[in-house]
Amino acid sequence: MDNPSSPPPNTPSDAAERRDLRAAMTSPVGDFEPFENEDEILGDQTVRDEAEEEDGEELFGDNMENDYRPMPELDHYDPALLDDEDDFSEMSQGDRFAAESEMRRRDRAAGIHRDDRDLGFGQSDDEDDVGPRAKRRAGEKAAVGEVEDTEMVESIENLEDTKGHSTKEWVSMLGPRTEIANRFQSFLRTFVDERGAYTYRDRIRRMCEQNMSSFVVSYTDLANKEHVLAYFLPEAPFQMLEIFDKVAKDMVLSIFPTYERVTTEIHVRISELPLIEELRTFRKLHLNQLVRTLGVVTATTGVLPQLSVIKYDCVKCGYVLGPFVQSQNTEIKPGSCPECQSTGPFSINMEQTLYRNYQKITLQESPGRIPAGRIPRSKDVILLADLCDQCKPGDELEVTGIYTNNYDGSLNTDQGFPVFATVIIANHVVVKDSKQVVQSLTDEDIATIQKLSKDPRIVERVVASMAPSIYGHDYIKRALALALFGGESKNPGEKHKVRGDINLLICGDPGTAKSQFLKYTEKVAPRAVFTTGQGASAVGLTAYVRRNPVSREWTLEAGALVLADQGVCLIDEFDKMNDQDRTSIHEAMEQQSISISKAGIVTSLQARCTVIAAANPIGGRYDPSMTFSENVNLSEPILSRFDVLCVVKDEFDPMQDQQLAKFVVHSHMKHHPSEEEQPELEEPQLKTVDEIPQDLLRQYIVYAKENIRPKLTNIDEDKIAKMYAQLRQESFATGSLPITVRHIESVIRMSEAHARMHLRENVMEADVSMAIRMMLESFIEAQKFSVMKKMRSTFQKYLSFQKDHSELLFFILRQLTLDQLAYIRCKDGPGATHVEIMERDLIERAKQLDIVNLKPFYESDLFRTNGFSYDPKRRIILQIVVDGNTA
C-alpha cells in the first residue's frame, strides 16, 4: 500500500512545465547541448509509475461521516462507575502546576523520571524545528535529573558485552561511559539498606554538611546492585573512578548548586574490596588494577602542592595558554603559542593554575605478617586531595588504590636497564586500630565474651591460657596477663600525662623459656613488634631521619617503639644493648613519646606501647647472693621504669625437675605432626581450670582494652600508703632496689588491669590486694637470698592474698622434703629411696600462715600427683625417691 503522505501523481501539464523550466535553465551559449529529456529516454515507464501510484485504497471516501453517527446501544454507561453526582471544584492553573511540581519532586527523590510536559507537547517531529536554546534547556534538565535524557543517549542493555574490545577501551567509549554514568547515578539515588534508608543520598548530604570532598561507596553494595560496574571497576580503575567522580559531582551540584565554592572536586572512595593482597605478592598481573593491601607506615613526606590544572604564559606575547589537565604519569606542555605561533619559552601562570594536595608515604609489611626468614617489603603510596595527613609513622594502614607504574630515572641509572618504579595511588585509606577489631566482633562473639567474664575463676583461666606450652612460672604468666590487659592512661587537664601501660622485665638463667614467653606474646597480642637488643640501635628502636634519594628531602622513619604504638614492643637480649642505645628509650617507656630534633625536623612521635623485655644475668647465671641490679647490667633509671621484675632461677629441685621432664616429653608426643591415635601420657599435673582458646582470648583482650575504663573509687588508700611506707623502709635497710613513687603508680595500673580482666568498670579491694601482692613478689624476688626469707615473713599477709591453701602448703612441704632429702643423702649416701616428713613440722609451719586444717590438702590432687602419701597412724608424710629423682 502506498504511503498516504506521498505527493499526488504528476499530470501532463506538470511535465510541460518541467520542460519549460529546464529550457529556461539551459545555458545560452550555443556550444553546449541542452539537457536530455528524460521522458524521451524512459518512454512510457513514467506513465506506468504514475498509474501504479494512483492504485491503492482511497481513505477519503464519501461515507466517512458515517463513522460519527450516533449509536445509542453503545452510549449506555454503568451508573456505579460514574462520579457525576459528586461535586468537585474546578482546579486552577496554579494549583495544577503546584501539584505537578510536587509530583515531580517526589519522583526525583524516588529515582523515577516522568516525561516533562514541555518535551511531550512542545517538541516537533523535525529536530530542525527545535532551536539551540530549547536544546540547551532540555539538556540542562536532563543533567540534573528532571527529565530522562532519552534522546541524547541510547541505553545499552548488555553493557557487559564489550564487543571484542578490552575493558579499558570499552569504558572509554562515549556510549558505555554514558551508560555507566546513568547506572551509577541510579545506584546512588535508589540504593537502600536493610532498614529502607537511602544509604548514599544520606552520605552525600552528611558529606556536604561537613564541607568534605569525598564519600565512601561499598564495593559489596555496588556488586549486589550493579554487578557489571563492579566487574569493570577493578579492571579499569582510572576510567571508572573518573566517571564515578563526575557523576558524584553532578549529584552534589544538583542538591547544593553552590557547593563548588567549597570544593571543585568530589571523589568516590571504594571500600570493602573482597581480596586483600600482601605487598610481596604484587606482580605484573596487578598493574593498573584496583587492589587492597595492608601495612605499617614507616615514612611520610610533607604535604606538597601538585599541579592539577595548568595554565602557561607565552613569554614572547603574554598570551595565556590552557587549561591543561595534568595526569599522574605524564607531564603536559604546550607545543606552540596559538597567538604568535612561537614554540616557547612558556612559564607557568601561578595565579590561574590549580593545585591539589600531594603526599607520599612508605608502606611496609606488618611485623606479624612477614614470612619466616624474609625481610619486610615496602611500597610507596601516593595520597592525593583529602587523603593527605590521615596517617603518621607507626600506623597500621589498610589501603585501597590503583597499583601503577611511573618512570624513575634514578632507578634506571642504578639498575643499568630500563625498569619502572611501581607505586599505589590511594583511593581509600583506613587506619586500623583496636576499634576496628571490636567492630568486627559479632553479637555472638560479644555474648561469649560477656559470659566468660562472669566466670568467678576468670583470672585463673586467663593465667592458665598464657603460654600453655610452658610448664610452671605462674608468677610470670600472671604478670604477662596484666601487661596485656594494661591499665588506664590519664592526662589531667592536658598538662601531665600518666601512662597506663605496664612494662615487664624478665631476667633469669639460660634455658628458662624467657624468649618463649616473648614469642607467645607476639602471637596473642593484637599488635606486637619483636626485636632483639643485639640487632637494635637507638634509631632502630625510636625514629630516625633520612634523605629521600629522589626528592632529596629529609623524611622521618619510625622505629620499633613507634611501630608498636598502642600495642606491645618485645625486646629480647635487652642487656646486650649499648648504654647509649638503651638510654634513648627512657622517654618512650615513661612519657610514651619520642622527640626528634634532627636535620631541621623538630617533632614528637607517639610510642604508647607496653615494653616486655628479657635479659640474661651478668656471667650467664643468676647469683642469689647479690641483688637484682648487681646481677643485671642495667642502670637504676631503666629498672625503675619497669613495673614488674620477674626473676627466673634454674634451681635444683628433684620434684619439679621430674614434673618438668614429664611435661616436656608429653608435649612433644602430643604435638608431633605424624601423631595418630595414641594412648595419651598421663598429665604431669591435673589442670584445676580450663584454658581459654587462643582466638577467644585475643578477642577478650581487645574487647576489654577498648570498652572497659576502670575507675578508682572505693579503694583502701591507707592500705597502699602503709605498704609503700613499709616497703621504702625495707628498701633502705637492705640497700636493694630503691622504691619510688613509680611503684605506687605501678600498683594502681595493675589494679586497673586486674579489674579489666573481670570486665569491671570500678576497681575493687580485691584488685588492689592482687596488685600489691604482684608488686611485693617482684620486689622480694629482686633481693639477696639472705634477706628474702625475712621479707617474705614481714609481708606474709599481703603475699598470701588469694593463694590456695594447698599451694601454700605444697610450697612448704617441698622445702621440708628437699631439706630432709639432702640430710639423708649426706648421712646414708646417694642411694636413699624414702623421705619421711613428720606431720608436726608441717603443722608448725602452716600455723604461721593461719592454716589449721590440713585434711583438704592431703586429699587434693596436688598432693597425690606429686608423689606424696600420708600415713595417719604414724602421722608422717612419705615420698619415695627412685634413682635420685622423686617418683
From Swiss-Prot:
One of its GO terms (molecular function) is single-stranded DNA binding. Pfam families: MCM, MCM2_N, MCM_lid, MCM_N, MCM_OB, WH_MCM2. ADP binds at S515, Q516. Keywords: ATP-binding, Cell cycle, Cell division, Chromosome, DNA replication, DNA-binding, Helicase, Hydrolase, Metal-binding, Nucleotide-binding, Nucleus, Phosphoprotein, Zinc, Zinc-finger. Transmembrane segments: none annotated. One of its GO terms (cellular component) is MCM complex. CDD domains: MCM2. Residues 1-150 are annotated as: Disordered. A motif (Arginine finger) lies at residues 640-643. Phosphorylated by the catalytic component of the Dbf4-dependent kinase (DDK) complex Cdc7. Residues 458-665 form the MCM domain. Residues 33-42, 50-60 have a biased composition (Acidic residues). The modification Phosphothreonine is found at T26. Residues 66-78, 97-119 have a biased composition (Basic and acidic residues). The keyword Zinc applies. It comes from the Eukaryota. The modification Phosphoserine is found at S27, S89, S92, S124. It catalyses: ATP + H2O = ADP + phosphate + H(+). GO terms for biological process: cell division; chromosome condensation; DNA replication; double-strand break repair via break-induced replication; mitotic DNA replication initiation; premeiotic DNA replication. It is found in: Nucleus; Chromosome. Early fractionation of eukaryotic MCM proteins yielded a variety of dimeric, trimeric and tetrameric complexes with unclear biological significance. Specifically a MCM467 subcomplex is shown to have in vitro helicase activity which is inhibited by the MCM2 subunit. The MCM2-7 hexamer is the proposed physiological active complex. Belongs to the MCM family. This is DNA replication licensing factor Mcm2. The gene is Mcm2.
